[in-house]
A protein has these predicted regions:
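Active-site anion-handling motifs in enzyme catalytic cores
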Residues: 1-323
Length: 323
């Protein structure tokens, strides 16, 4: 059988990286070297994913002289529908695939967000290429399924693997081919690395903060203020160290930006460590050595859950509640 994974954002999001690594390992008996369509091929190469998947660039420049472009342009201008235009960036990579037995939509996180309609035309292209479509390791906001277009997109999948019970209960009402299994990243192994200077094994509280959480705050500044209150309490009332641990390091959405703010404020206490970027397995190892963990990124918290580290999630979507 030949498999392809698509809708992968790139490995500087270590949750995306973890899904690719574990999915490839879990399905190795079906396809020992699946194809990975990636939005950012160079990131995946930098983190070594080429060792077990064939990486292909998913996004390409749109041919503005093509009939597809003209039709998408008219839809955008006449009906304010930009989804077909966005999908054209994916079409070339999908058309160039060999015969595919099963295509796995691995960007299951994306069905938590309001722009999910972008994916229906991409799935249209993939459905013409692959014998079976799978929505892999997904979470879906239940209210999004009230939209007819989103329901129709969900119905097309031959298999849906929901990773938590809230999404499972909602999805199975729309598509009976829905099963419940843990996020594949629960299977991710740790990769031992040297712990940062100042990190005291099993007496360090890990903290992760994301720009996305800050974007969703209802009162400007409240997220950082609450993290500061937490850190001040830990410093004053306990003997624990604090490790600030990034899990997404995209330039446009980099956990290190708010974490550096926190580090600069408290570094003189000698109690705070800013962890550098590593691959997802090494970050999981560092998280596994924490006494407890407070995290915003879904797969940072999965790294903690799956190594039995007590975890508090700072979340804004069904992922945080469900997992």
């Amino acid at each position: 059988m030949k498999l392809v994974m698509y809708a992968h954002g790139g490995s500087k999001n270590h949750g995306c990286e973890a899904i690719v690594r574990t999915t490839a390992k879990l399905l190795t008996e079906i396809d020992s070297r699946p194809i990975l369509l990636s939005y950012k091929k160079e990131e995946d190469e930098a983190y070594g994913l080429y060792q077990f998947v064939e990486i292909r660039q998913e996004l390409h420049e749109i041919n503005k002289k093509s009939p597809d472009f003209m039709l998408a342009y008219l839809r955008q201008k006449l009906f304010h529908d930009y989804h077909r235009m966005d999908a054209l960036m994916h079409k070339k990579a999908i058309n160039e695939l060999p015969a595919i037995d099963a295509a796995l939509f691995i960007g299951g996180d994306n069905y938590c967000y309001s722009d999910v309609k972008n994916y229906a035309p991409i799935n249209d292209y993939m459905q013409k290429k692959a014998k079976k479509l799978v929505l892999w390791g997904t979470s879906v906001e239940p209210e999004l399924l009230e939209d007819k277009a989103i329901r129709e997109d969900i119905k097309r999948f031959d298999l849906i693997v929901a990773r938590e019970s809230i999404s499972f209960e909602s999805l199975k009402k729309v598509n009976g081919n829905t099963i419940l299994l843990p996020d594949p990243a629960f299977h991710l192994p740790c990769e031992k690395v040297e712990l940062p200077e100042g990190f005291v094994e099993e007496n360090t509280i890990g903290i992760n903060l994301s720009p996305l959480i800050i974007e969703h705050e209802k009162e400007k500044g409240c997220v950082l203020a609450n993290y500061e209150n937490l850190m001040e309490y830990i410093i004053k009332e306990t003997d624990c160290q604090i490790a600030l641990i990034p899990h997404v390091v995209w330039e446009s959405n980099d956990d290190r930006t708010p974490l550096r703010q926190l580090y600069e404020k408290y570094k003189e206490t000698g109690r705070v460590v800013l962890v550098e970027d590593h691959n997802c397995m090494a970050q999981k190892y560092i998280i596994s050595k924490c006494r407890m963990f407070v995290g915003a990124r879904t797969h940072a918290t999965i790294a903690a859950y799956s190594t039995c580290v007590p975890t508090l999630v700072v979340g804004y979507s069904v992922k945080a509640r469900g997992i």
